């Protein structure tokens, strides 16, 4: 299970003099994790994407000199999950405005690079809007939106393939991939006895449908994939593989 470490400098745990000293000593980067509050099948908590975003951000910060991790934004753009109780969601323009407002304040106290790290694919439109505005309104702030944060990345899928986990099992939502990661991060929040397969076809073929009609049109239980073979140890490997790929992309 993950625990906080001095190598994962959470901004919210620092005092203002500590932040000032960190910036003076070269901490010029902030990683802003973006999650969601939405259903993740009958077995995972609504905050799954937020927990995953925080974990990825900390792992990425450990690989990036001078990086601080901002508190995760726990509500994203999740209207495709309408019909499942517990949903909290923002319009894309609202989330983009929140990101821009936070970035302005960061730039004012010395941040010169912002990493937008989303663990929820539905945040894509808001992130694109935010990046467009930031590049126009804060040209001195370098903004990085990783290509691999909006979908299962090749690094995690490679780990799955080594274990004999097919992409249809790994899934796009609450499948083996996310369930394994939550078993590593917060096993106390996983209702393993309730885990069951959902849609298990080719994931790429349903993306358009779920974006237009919502997940309920594709999977009544909210699962895209099959969590039955999820394992905590593999979840740790997924997270490390994702973070390594992100760091490689950023440092290229």
Regions found by a protein language model. Give the residues of each.
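Extended, histidine- and acidic-residue-enriched regions that form the cofactor-binding/catalytic faces
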Residues: 1-115, 119-252
């Amino acid at each position: 299970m993950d625990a906080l470490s001095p190598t994962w400098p959470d901004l919210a745990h620092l005092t203002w003099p500590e932040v000032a000293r960190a910036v003076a000593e070269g901490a010029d980067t902030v990683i802003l994790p973006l999650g969601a509050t939405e259903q993740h099948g009958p077995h995972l908590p609504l905050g799954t994407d937020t927990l995953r975003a925080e974990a990825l951000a900390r792992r990425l910060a450990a690989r990036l000199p001078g990086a601080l991790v901002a508190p995760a934004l726990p509500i994203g753009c999740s209207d495709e999950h309408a019909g499942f109780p517990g949903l909290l969601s923002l319009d894309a323009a609202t989330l983009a405005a929140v990101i821009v407002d936070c970035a302005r304040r960061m730039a004012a106290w010395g941040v010169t690079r912002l990493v937008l790290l989303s663990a929820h694919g539905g945040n894509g439109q808001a992130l694109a809007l935010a990046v467009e505005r930031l590049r126009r309104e804060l040209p001195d702030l370098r903004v990085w939106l990783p290509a691999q944060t909006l979908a299962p990345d090749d690094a995690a899928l490679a780990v799955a393939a080594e274990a004999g986990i097919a992409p249809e099992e790994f899934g796009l939502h609450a499948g083996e991939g996310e369930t394994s990661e939550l078993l590593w991060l917060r096993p106390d929040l996983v209702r393993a006895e309730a885990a069951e397969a959902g849609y298990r076809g080719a994931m790429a073929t349903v993306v358009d449908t779920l974006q237009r009609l919502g997940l309920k049109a594709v999977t009544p239980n909210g699962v895209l994939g099959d969590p039955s073979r999820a394992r905590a140890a593999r979840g740790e490997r997924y997270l490390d593989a994702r973070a390594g790929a992100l760091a490689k992309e950023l440092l290229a």
